[in-house]
């Protein structure tokens, strides 16, 4: 969802009551209008997904996983994950645990890679050209974060505790659990990297479905 219109106080306040009180409070807690808009946009996307699944958004309750990932109570086959960056909020929904991440691509120093990644991932980054480094870095970063979110552990899981295997087919080498994970990337949004990770196996190509607030 492109959330720029939600930065308007009038639009923001007009849509705010459409989401649960907990999301209203979270959205209003941000200092900057862009962050408030992103948070509200994420809540509106979740509302829409719940309605499409035949679930009344007004009657849902959430609980937190061990890694503080929100999980929907009473609906074991409805798994979701939210992410936002720049002016976009995204939502992924699946029938098994899912993690999604979107990042707006900006300049970042190569030296940063040495501090956060597994040695195999560092080798991948070091092999990138100057032109390819920024998109390659954000591909890797979003793939890693999508996996961390799919496990439910989030950033309680160290970035160097597992290795994303970058190749013709994306994979992960990990000892976090004994589950299998599938990955895919969405490259339909220029200037952004988007990755999806789902527990249970391979994922096909996922098209980006844009929702714009007018």
Model region roles, listed by residue range:
Residues 1-214:
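Core catalytic alpha/beta fold that binds nucleotide/phospho-ligands
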